[in-house]
Amino acid sequence: LLLFISPILLDDWKHRSMLAVKPIRQWKYLLQKISSYWLVNMALVILALFVVFLVQSLSFGWDNLTTPFLVFRGEEEALMFPLQFIGIVLLFAACVFLFLINLVAWCNQLSRNKMVGFIAGVMVIWAEPIFRSMKIYPSFADKLPLYYVNFGSVIQGMKDDFYTTGTFTISNGCASLLVGAFVFFLLTVGTSFWQERHRRGGLV
């Protein structure tokens, strides 16, 4: 759903006149647009998690929220409270959404074709499981945000052989995704400035 509607909501080609009525710098305009869309997506995620845990609590009792459950961190077993797990999921989802939204925003600046952003997002989402199935494990994989987009594997699949090195962690993932999002934001702003200068040069 995110990939289908992102190119539409983040499309600036048809709305450049908004900058005339709202005289702010281009990078501030893009930042506000990306931030507002990110907040909407996070609100939907929080609502979905709330409904899931509400149904679960009504079915199995409210004590279920305070009862720790078993998780794996590498080869080690540990106990984690449900609310702690929800916090980790929300933090990681926030980073993943921020990365994907900035990626799609950059694709929108590069091409008017909205399918470009959709295809780029799909490729990033499926890159990690495809590489894993092909036994492609670069030494720097834990530094690449695309290996963390499939965050279910990171949060739940720590005992998988792909994570036995212990370098694929939540903290590394959040840092990698935030850096990746910042890089794509800079690329989006830079591409926008270049296109605007090129357009003005063409008019002259």
PLM feature segments, named:
Residues L3-K22, Q26:
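Transmembrane helix boundary and interhelical loop/hinge segments in multi-pass membrane proteins
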